C-alpha cells in the first residue's frame, strides 16, 4: 500500500483527556451536613404550621366570643393566645359549676384537695428559713381567705356511704392528736382532754371543734372530712385527724392548716383528690 494513502492516526479527545476528569459518584453527606442543609426548610415549615394554627384559633375564638372578625382582623399572636386562655378559664368555671350541681361529691373533693395543698404550703413555710415573715403571713392569710370562700359555697348532702366531719381551723398552738370516732356512737356532746369537743347533729353528722381563744367571737372556717360509715354492729370507722402543723412561735395569729385525711387513710383511699393547681 502506498505510504501516502495511509491515514495518520489522530489523537482521540477522550484518550487525551486527563484521568481526573472522569465522572465519580458524589460522596454521601453526613448527618450534621444534612441537618444543616435541611434546617431552613424545617424552620419554614414550622412557621407555616404555627401561622396556620393561629389563624384557625383566631377564627374559633372570635366565633366563640361572638365578635366581629372584620374588626379584629389585625390581632397579634399574643392577643389570640391571651383571648384563648381567658375563654378556656371561663369554660372551666362553667364546667365546674355544672359538675357541682350534678355530682355533690365534687365539691368535697375540691375542698379536700385545696386543704391538702394549703397544708403542704404551710408545712413548707414553717420549715423554710429563707422566706420573709411578712410574705409568709400575707400568703397564708390569702390562702385562709380563699379557704373561707370555698367553705361558704353551697354544699349538698354527701352520699350515705360517707359521713362529713367538720374540723375548725385553730389559730392558737394546736395539739396533734389522732381522733377515732364512730358516727353511730356520737349521741351526746363529748369533751376530750385539752378542750376538744365533739358535737353531734340530728342528721347523723358531727363536728370536731378545736378551741380557738383568739377567735371566740367569730369562728374560723370549717373543713369537711370524710370517714367511711359503718353499721352499729360493725367495727368503728376511723377518721384520724393528723398533720396539725404549728409555727405559732413565728406567727401566733395565723390560722393553721389541718390535713383532711391521715397518711394511712390517704394511701388507702381509692378516690383521687383533685388539686386546684
Curated annotation (Swiss-Prot):
Species for this entry: Xenopus laevis (African clawed frog)
Annotated compartments: Nucleus
Domain comment (free text): Has a particular type of basic domain (presence of a helix-interrupting proline) that binds to the N-box (CACNAG), rather than the canonical E-box (CANNTG). The C-terminal WRPW motif is a transcriptional repression domain necessary for the interaction with Groucho/TLE family members, transcriptional corepressors recruited to specific target DNA by Hairy-related proteins. The WPRW motif is also required for the inductive function, independent of a transcription regulation activity.
Known partners and oligomeric status: Transcription repression requires formation of a complex with a corepressor protein of the Groucho/TLE family. Interacts with the bHLH protein hes6; this interaction may inhibit the transcriptional repressor activity. Binds DNA in the form of a heterodimer with the bHLH protein hey1/hrt1. Interacts (via Orange domain) with id3 (via HLH domain).
Sequence ranges of Basic and acidic residues compositional bias: 26-35
GO CC entries: nucleus
Induction per the UniProt record: By Notch-signaling. Acts in a complex regulatory loop with other transcription factors and neural crest inducing signals at the neural plate border.
Name recorded for this polypeptide: Transcription factor HES-4-B
Ranges for domain bHLH: 34-91
One GO molecular-function entry: protein heterodimerization activity
Cleaved signal peptide residues: none
Amino acid at each position: 500500500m502506498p505510504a501516502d494513502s495511509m491515514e495518520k492516526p489522530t489523537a482521540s479527545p477522550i484518550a487525551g483527556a486527563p484521568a481526573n476528569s472522569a465522572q465519580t459518584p458524589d460522596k454521601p453527606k453526613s448527618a450534621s451536613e444534612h441537618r444543616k442543609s435541611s434546617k431552613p426548610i424545617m424552620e419554614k415549615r414550622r412557621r407555616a404550621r404555627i401561622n396556620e394554627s393561629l389563624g384557625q384559633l383566631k377564627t374559633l375564638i372570635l366565633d366563640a366570643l361572638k365578635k366581629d372578625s372584620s374588626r379584629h382582623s389585625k390581632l397579634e399572636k399574643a392577643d389570640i393566645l391571651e383571648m384563648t386562655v381567658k375563654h378556656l378559664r371561663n369554660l372551666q368555671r362553667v364546667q365546674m359549676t355544672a359538675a357541682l350541681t350534678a355530682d355533690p361529691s365534687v365539691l368535697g373533693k375540691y375542698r379536700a384537695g385545696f386543704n391538702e395543698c394549703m397544708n403542704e404550703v404551710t408545712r413548707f413555710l414553717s420549715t423554710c428559713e429563707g422566706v420573709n415573715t411578712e410574705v409568709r403571713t400575707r400568703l397564708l392569710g390569702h390562702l385562709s381567705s380563699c379557704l373561707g370562700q370555698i367553705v361558704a359555697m353551697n354544699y349538698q348532702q354527701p352520699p350515705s356511704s360517707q359521713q362529713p366531719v367538720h374540723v375548725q381551723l385553730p389559730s392558737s398552738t394546736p395539739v396533734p392528736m389522732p381522733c377515732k370516732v364512730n358516727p353511730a356512737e356520737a349521741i351526746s356532746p363529748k369533751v376530750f382532754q385539752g378542750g376538744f369537743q365533739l358535737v353531734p347533729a340530728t342528721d347523723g353528722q358531727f363536728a370536731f371543734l378545736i378551741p380557738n381563744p383568739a377567735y371566740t367571737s367569730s369562728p374560723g372556717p370549717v373543713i369537711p372530712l370524710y370517714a367511711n360509715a359503718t353499721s352499729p354492729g360493725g367495727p368503728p370507722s376511723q377518721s384520724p385527724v393528723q398533720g396539725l402543723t404549728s409555727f405559732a412561735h413565728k406567727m401566733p395569729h395565723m390560722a393553721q392548716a389541718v390535713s383532711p385525711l391521715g397518711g394511712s387513710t390517704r394511701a388507702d383511699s381509692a378516690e383521687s383528690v383533685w388539686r386546684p393547681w
